[in-house]
Each structure stands twice: as C-alpha cells, then as structure tokens.
C-alpha cells in the first residue's frame, strides 16, 4: 500500500541562484559559504556536477575540473523564502505531513491517493505547480512508497526531475541493487557494525532476521528497520522535545575550516525549519565539534548563546557565525 510521497529538490541552492539570476541558467554554478579562494562548494548545479563537481569540492579543484564555472555566495534568506513558496505550492496539491529540511518534504497518501496511478498523477501535479508558481529552474525528484524511508530512497533513485514508485509487492527485492549507505541512518559507524554482523550488501540487510537487526542497532530501531524494509508504516512518535538538532560526520574533503562552516550552516537551516514546523521557539543555541578523537564541548569559550524566543533562520545563522568566529574554527 502506497502511503508516502517524498519530494526532494534537486541541487536546491544552485537552482535558486539560477532562478533569480537568469544569466546563470544552463551554466555550471558552485555555491560557496563565503567568497574566498580557500573555501569549497556547499552546492553545485547539475551543469557543474557533470564535470565531477559536488558538495565539498574546493574552489581550486572546481576551477581545474571546469574552468568556466561561476561561483556565487550563498544567500540563505532567499533560500528560506523559496522554501516557503515551495511548501505552499506542494500544499496546494497535497497536504504536507512533515518538512524534513530546506529541500525535502513528505506528503502522506490517504484513501484513493494510495492507488499507483492516482499517486503518480498527484506527483506530476506537484511538479507542474512548482514549475509554474515557484520557478522554472526548481526541479524535484519524487519518490512514492509504503513508508517514508522507502519513499526517500525512491526519490534518490532517479535524478534530476525523477519519479519512482516502489510498491509493496516489489519488496524487499527492489532494494537489492542499492548500497547500504543509501539508507538513512546507516553512516560509517553503523556500516561497521553491520559488517561485523556479516552484512555487506543491501540484499544481506533485507534478508537479515529481525533479531539480528535488533542486536546490530541495539534496540527497537533495528526491529523497525527490518519492518520498514518490507513496507511497514511507522508514523511519528508523540514525544515532547526540549531541544532539537542535527549532526553530520564530515567526509574527508570537507574536513577543513570552510567545509565545516558550510555544513554547520546547512545543519542550522534544517534545525530552524523543524523548529518552525513544530511550532516551537528557541531561547538558546549551541554547537559542538569532534576533532580527531577529541571532543570540544559547548559550555564556555563562546560555544553557546542565549537569547529571547526566536524562530528566524537568519538570526540563527548570525548566532552561528558569532560562535564560530569566537574561536571554535581554530580547533
């Protein structure tokens, strides 16, 4: 049964830049956190990706790969504005159940919408609405599946401007060609734990008994993973949160000052989106960085900040830069 429709905008930051600056359309574009020679791309247009440029590619390497690339400095307030317009466009077609980040959102399919043909028609309507009311440069890939995790996987299977449906009857075999790291929640450490358990491929993950995955994940998350790979639906848990945040393990090419700051900016945006979506306000913000087996905690040294009730992404980004330049970037 199809229950989730996942919308993932393609090369979002770069696409917004091409939308507001027509002279960039059709050209390779790299989005930088700051206009500096020693920084790296936090986003790249599909024209740039064709040359091998991606998130984390340094300015120097990008120039070497594509001498005609155009660099622009990130404009986060504008990205937030376009995000709000995109959410409104999707909501005119189907109710948005949750916004997961600045370029991802999910709609829950109900009633007749769970029919494959109807779900695909809704997806096409969403694409048309975005192109006509948000911008012709804003393309998205849509995944449709029995649950959120599978719908997100489906949205990654065909880019750009893709539409992929995974049906219950196709599971779990449809997932076998994927990599383990394609599954949300399987990072470097979880991959190592899976390998210790003798699981090296997606086919082996899908074949693993529920008890094995319960042990690997160390709890109910493993049981849920087993079930979700087979199409089981898990709705959001009713919990009361006092804080929310995001973390990310930097790939080797981003393990530098500019790369870390660029990722922190993305994480801040994602957290701010969730904050507003859940109707909360923040009165404090903290950041922490783990460096080469050392951990720099947030208390002291200007790594946290208190303020009045806030929801604004721009405000949080200003706080982030103040915390970063207070000395955290020197770790």
Outline where the language-model segments fall.
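Gly/Gly-Pro- and Ser/Thr-rich, intrinsically disordered tail segments characteristic of DNA damage-repair
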Residues: 1-233, 273
């Amino acid at each position: 049964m199809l229950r989730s429709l996942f919308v993932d905008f393609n090369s979002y930051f770069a696409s917004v830049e091409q939308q507001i600056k027509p002279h960039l359309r059709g050209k390779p574009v790299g989005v930088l956190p700051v206009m500096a020679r020693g920084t790296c791309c936090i986003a790249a247009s599909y024209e740039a990706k064709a040359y091998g440029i991606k998130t984390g590619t340094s300015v120097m390497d990008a120039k070497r790969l594509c001498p005609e690339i155009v660099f622009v400095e990130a404009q986060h307030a504008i990205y937030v504005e376009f995000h709000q317009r995109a959410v409104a466009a999707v909501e005119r077609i189907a109710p948005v159940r949750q916004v997961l980040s600045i370029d991802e959102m999910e709609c829950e399919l109900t009633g007749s919408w769970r029919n494959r043909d109807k779900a695909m028609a809704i997806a096409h309507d969403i694409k048309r609405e975005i192109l006509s009311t948000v911008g012709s440069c804003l393309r998205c890939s849509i995944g449709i599946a029995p649950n959120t995790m599978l719908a997100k996987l489906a949205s990654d299977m065909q880019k750009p401007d893709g539409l992929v449906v995974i049906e219950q009857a196709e599971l779990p075999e449809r997932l076998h060609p994927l990599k383990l790291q394609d599954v949300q929640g399987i990072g470097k450490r979880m991959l190592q734990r899976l390998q210790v358990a003798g699981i090296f491929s997606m086919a082996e993950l899908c074949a693993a008994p529920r008890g094995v995955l319960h042990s690997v994940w160390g709890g109910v998350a493993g049981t849920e993973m087993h079930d979700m790979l087979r199409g089981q639906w898990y709705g959001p848990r009713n919990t009361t949160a006092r804080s929310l945040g995001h973390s990310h393990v930097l790939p080797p090419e981003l393990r530098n000052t500019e790369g870390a700051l660029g990722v922190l900016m993305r994480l801040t945006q994602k957290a701010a989106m969730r904050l507003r979506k859940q109707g909360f306000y923040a009165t404090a913000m903290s950041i922490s960085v783990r460096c080469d087996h050392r951990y720099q905690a947030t208390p002291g040294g200007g790594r946290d900040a208190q303020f009045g009730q806030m929801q604004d992404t721009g405000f949080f980004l200003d706080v982030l830069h103040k915390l970063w330049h207070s000395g955290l970037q020197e770790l």
